[in-house]
């Protein structure tokens, strides 16, 4: 099975290539914090030899509570992303929530992301696809992995085949998510790169009444399980003070644990991809 290669600058993204990290923080809390977080990611990924793309959101449009922090907004967020790109010479990924945002975001960001909850919204999908940008498609918590073919088809029909699929867990009763490891293989059959969003797979949606809970202590176990499937990349959020983060702190890795965490996953990815394929069908 031929695996498609998506290129972002000098980074090659494919299921049979060394894994790429989409990493950063959940939401832009401030310019200074974003710079601090990106600086540490750059230091660690350069040391470990992991291709890196900075990730953050300028707006969290689906917060549980109307009083929850959402972010600085698109205009201010794009200014921060531009500064990060200039300062650290790294690509940037962020999410798009409405069709009108697609074009201006794609002019600044190297990858635009289709949020899981919005992944079946055809107008949004088409608007994003028509930019020609690389798109990271989050699999909705309510979709089976094989249903991702319909979202891929919408993008392809709009003329865009620069696509990445991303697993972030499936609803399992109330306030819980699970990750079906068999789903990775199903999505890899579409030949597009597949990523694992380990951070949001650890969510307990609505678990704290007015916000999501999480299981940070299990991030290493779940990340190893996912990356053992031979994936194109990992999606990760970290924070210097997760307990006081403005969004999804319970799921975020502590920033000072980033290096030992990624070092283990790098070794695992190298090992898994050194194995020959065994055809068992």
From Swiss-Prot:
The gene is kdsA. GO terms for molecular function: 3-deoxy-8-phosphooctulonate synthase activity. It is an enzyme of class 2 (transferase). Disulfide bonds: none annotated. It comes from Pseudomonas putida (strain GB-1). This is 2-dehydro-3-deoxyphosphooctonate aldolase. One of its GO terms (biological process) is keto-3-deoxy-D-manno-octulosonic acid biosynthetic process. Belongs to the KdsA family. InterPro entries: Aldolase_TIM (IPR013785), DAHP1/KDSA (IPR006218), KDO8P_synthase (IPR006269). PANTHER family: PHOSPHO-2-DEHYDRO-3-DEOXYHEPTONATE ALDOLASE. Keywords: Cytoplasm, Lipopolysaccharide biosynthesis, Transferase. Its EC number is 2.5.1.55. SUPFAM superfamilies: Aldolase (SSF51569). HAMAP family: KDO8P_synth. It is found in: Cytoplasm. Pathway: Carbohydrate biosynthesis; 3-deoxy-D-manno-octulosonate biosynthesis; 3-deoxy-D-manno-octulosonate from D-ribulose 5-phosphate: step 2/3; Bacterial outer membrane biogenesis; lipopolysaccharide biosynthesis. It catalyses: D-arabinose 5-phosphate + phosphoenolpyruvate + H2O = 3-deoxy-alpha-D-manno-2-octulosonate-8-phosphate + phosphate. GO terms for cellular component: cytoplasm. Pfam families: DAHP_synth_1 (PF00793).
């Amino acid at each position: 099975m031929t695996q498609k290669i998506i290129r972002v600058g000098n980074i090659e993204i494919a299921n049979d290539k060394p894994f790429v990290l989409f990493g950063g923080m959940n939401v832009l809390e401030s310019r200074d914090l974003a710079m601090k977080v990106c600086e540490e990611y750059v230091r660690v990924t350069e040391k470990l030899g992991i291709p890196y793309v900075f990730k953050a959101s300028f707006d969290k449009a689906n917060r549980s509570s109307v009083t929850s922090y959402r972010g600085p907004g698109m205009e201010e967020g794009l200014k921060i992303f531009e500064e990060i790109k200039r300062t650290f010479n790294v690509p940037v990924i962020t999410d798009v929530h409405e069709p009108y945002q697609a074009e201006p975001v794609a002019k600044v960001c190297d990858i635009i992301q289709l949020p899981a909850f919005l992944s079946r919204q055809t107008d949004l999908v088409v608007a994003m696809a028509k930019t020609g940008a690389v798109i990271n498609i989050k699999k909705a918590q309510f979709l089976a992995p094989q249903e991702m073919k319909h979202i891929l088809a919408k993008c392809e029909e709009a003329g865009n085949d620069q696509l990445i699929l991303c697993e972030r867990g499936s609803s399992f009763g109330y306030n819980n998510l699970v990750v079906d490891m068999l789903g990775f293989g199903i999505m890899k059959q579409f030949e597009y790169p597949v990523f694992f969003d380990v951070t949001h797979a650890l969510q307990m949606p609505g678990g704290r009444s007015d916000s999501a809970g999480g299981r940070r202590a299990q991030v290493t176990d779940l990340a190893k399980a996912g990356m053992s499937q031979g994936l194109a990349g990992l999606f990760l959020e970290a924070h210097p003070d997760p307990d006081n983060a403005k969004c999804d702190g319970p799921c975020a890795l502590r920033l000072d644990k980033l290096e030992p965490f990624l070092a283990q996953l790098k070794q695992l990815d190298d090992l898994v991809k050194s194995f020959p394929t065994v055809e068992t069908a």
